[in-house]
UniProtKB/Swiss-Prot annotation:
Function: Possesses single-stranded DNA-stimulated ATPase and ATP-dependent DNA helicase (5' to 3') activity suggesting a role in nuclear processes such as recombination and transcription. May participate in several chromatin remodeling complexes that mediate the ATP-dependent exchange of histones and remodel chromatin by shifting nucleosomes. Involvement in these complexes is likely required for transcriptional activation of selected genes and DNA repair in response to DNA damage. Has a role in gonadal development.
SUPFAM superfamilies linked: Nucleic acid-binding proteins (SSF50249), P-loop containing nucleoside triphosphate hydrolases (SSF52540)
Segments forming a coiled coil: none
GO CC term (a single one): NuA4 histone acetyltransferase complex
Tissue specificity of this protein: Expressed in gonadal cells.
Classification lineage: Eukaryota, Metazoa, Ecdysozoa, Nematoda, Chromadorea
Subunit record text: Forms homohexameric rings. May form a dodecamer with ruvb-1 made of two stacked hexameric rings.
Name of the encoding gene: ruvb-2
Name under which the protein is recorded: RuvB-like 2
Signal peptide stretch: none
Highest rank taxon of the organism: Eukaryota
Catalytic activity, EC: 3.6.4.12
Molecular function per GO: ATP binding; ATP hydrolysis activity; DNA helicase activity
Organism field: Caenorhabditis elegans
Binding site for ATP: 73-80
Keywords, alphabetical: ATP-binding, Chromatin regulator, Cytoplasm, DNA damage, DNA repair, Helicase, Hydrolase, Nucleotide-binding, Nucleus, Transcription, Transcription regulation
Amino acid sequence: MATLDGINVKDIVKVERTSVHSHITGLGLNDRLEAEYVSGGMVGQVAARQAAGLIVKMIQEGKIAGRALLVTGEPGAGKTAIAIAISKELGEDTPFVSIVASEIYSNEINKTEALTQAFRRALGIQIKEETEVLEGEVISLEVDRSANGMGPKVGKLTMRTTDMETIYDLGSKMVDACLKEKVMPGDVIQVDKASGRVTRLGRSFNRSHDYDAMGPKVKLVQCPDGEIQKRRETVHTVCLHDIDVINSRTQGYVALFSGDTGEIKAEVRDQINKKVLEWREEGKAKFVPGVLFIDEAHMLDIECFSFLNRAIEGELSPLIIMATNRLIEKVRGTDVESAHGIPSDFLDRMLIINAIPYTKEDTAKILSIRCDEEGVKLQPTALDLLVKLQEATSLRYCIHLIAASEVIRIRSKAEIVTTDHIGSAYRLFFDTKRSEKILTEESAGFLQ
């Protein structure tokens, strides 16, 4: 807390949540799609990352929509990390929907409807819209109010660019919009002619000396050039599921926010598909096939796989990425055993990426990256201890120990996390193997 002229000023504390995969920023590939050993928050898994990079390239070029990809490997081998890295590489414009296979089982909607909704959320459409806007620096804003304050407000707005200056007469709606945005002379604004929406772009550099001090939210921008009235092309990206929900009932947009979508009729989706294909042929819209990631894919039953068999071959279908850690498993709903718990006919349609277990060096680097992500300083000996513990426990358990050790370090008022702090956290929190051992030794005391 700082003191300014006898007044206590509190520092603004930025709260950031760090998840298990928050350190991942991409696949870490170069221009030739070759994976670097440590890059983008990813460590090792060179072959798997290169394969995922090829998938990303084909998605961006629109060559692999309607396919299925399976990521296999042991627990803790980085399967989900690869999927998240793919989503980061694709960017915000490409829809990426992540679900767990058990999510589709519900009493409210059937399995195929839940899968269809997930499919449609992973299908985007970019709609182009041309709008006319007024953009310039405000020279003056005059508002005339009636004497009793009850009548409509009118006003005049003077705007200029580097090339011209114009005066506009404002009605009551535009006056209210300007007052709501607190528009004042020197502001650079943008007015949408169709909707009347006023947007403050910032403060003009020409008026930067009007005040000695300005708040952190004040943005200084150049005065626009050219004509005040311009045509702007805006691209809106929406998913097909949102369009389905809005058109499924009278007040569909309410269900869009509440999440109570229910089952949507096939006729509604067929009409939307026809309209989307028409827009694509006319050049009004661009179809963006996204990615549907299904974790724990072995939890899907035979009915889901039979539905997916046909769904991935449709004209409007995203890329499906599945992940599983099972070897040989019975296909749910049958007595037939198959690799990864997935029917053989569906496996034949998939490209398979194998995530190999991390080496000791990989683990040390991952733990070091996690420490940097969480802002924890470790002694070299403490990091070595974590690597040894990982061999006896698991990588996830050791990642959890980092945060616990940091709390113990703060309580003991030490400057850096040592082996003693790691040991204290290890004794307080049990891993799976030690917990199973205690259950076996003290089984008589538990309810059977």
